[in-house]
Design a protein with these regions (language model features):
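N-terminal hydrophobic targeting signals that begin at the initiator methionine
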Residues: 1-2, 23
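N-terminal signal peptide c-region/cleavage motif recognized by signal peptidases
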Residues: 13-18
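Bacterial N-terminal signal peptides
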Residues: 2-12
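Mature extracellular/passenger domains of Gram-negative fimbrial/pilin and adhesin proteins
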Residues: 20-272
Length: 272
């Protein structure tokens, strides 16, 4: 059999808990001033089948990116109405249809840019509101399964450089369990900082399942530590390279049918 693990690298996210659905959102930048402009990316968005859209049947409902403020919820008015980052979703019965509609309208990955009401923003994610977004009416709700990515410190920008896949190649059943393969990556930040680096499946689970059963999976590791628990790293500034290792560790119980298997993992920076 042949096994390939695909990797997505993200920065500035809160680590998520296990979920059947998850939207990964990455803050890119935020300017200073009373009315900051933020940039963010929606990197991936998956939904479990059959989950009801929480605002299905409402007279009007919108979804899009916005920030959570220290004082509470956002309004979505700037992001939706002024900058066109949102779609109307009250007509879709399921969350899976909502994700598909957003992907069709905007594309994923999707980069959004918009001005917010205050510099006191804590994180950025996907939000919805079951009426037309209105300036000053801050009652938008975080979309179930959306990561709220922690906004980095002022003037701090970090990036991850990492191969997009780990190729285990052809492996026999007798040598499968415990087999590892690693790739090297680098993190660069404008300022010195301390981070935790996490790895997990793109659906938010601890392991990357490689077939339809839980008996065949990859356990992602960072610097030979559990990707789920995270590895702490001190990062130098001035955009210097700080190396790390990503490892895919295979596990199987029983015989795996020969074939070609792939899975999707995500590597996440969380600022401390």
């Amino acid at each position: 059999m042949s096994i390939l693990l695909l990797i997505i690298a993200l920065t500035s996210l809160f680590p998520s808990r296990p979920a059947n659905a998850i939207a990964y959102v990455m803050p890119v930048s935020m300017t200073s001033g009373a009315w900051p402009r933020v940039e963010m990316d929606i990197l991936s968005w998956s939904e479990a089948s059959g989950v009801t859209n929480p605002c299905y049947g409402s007279t009007e409902c919108w979804i899009g990116p916005d920030v959570l403020y220290a004082s509470g919820a956002p309004s979505l008015s700037g992001s939706c109405l002024d900058y066109g980052n949102c779609i109307r979703i009250n007509q879709y019965r399921t969350a899976e249809e909502v994700a598909a509609a957003f992907r069709s309208a905007k594309g994923i990955p999707y980069r959004a840019s918009f001005v917010i009401d205050s510099p006191n923003a804590t994180c950025i994610g996907l939000f919805y509101v079951n009426h037309r977004p209105t300036a000053g009416v801050r009652n938008a709700i975080q979309w179930p399964g959306s990561v709220c990515g922690k906004i980095p410190p002022t003037n701090q920008t970090c990036s991850i450089s990492l191969p997009s896949f780990v190729d285990h190649g052809a492996i026999s059943n007798t040598s499968l369990n415990g087999k590892t393969n690693s790739v090297s990556g680098n993190i660069a930040c404008t300022q010195a900082t301390n981070i935790n680096l996490f790895a997990r499946s793109t659906t938010g689970e601890r392991y990357v399942y490689l077939n339809s059963t839980p008996n065949f999976y990859s356990n992602p590791l960072i610097n030979n530590q559990s990707g789920w628990n995270g590895a702490n790293m001190n990062i130098s500034g001035n955009n210097a390279s700080n190396p790390f290792t990503f490892t895919s560790e295979l596990h199987a119980s029983g015989t795996v049918t020969p074939g070609y298997y792939t899975g999707n993992a995500v590597v996440i920076i969380a600022f401390n």
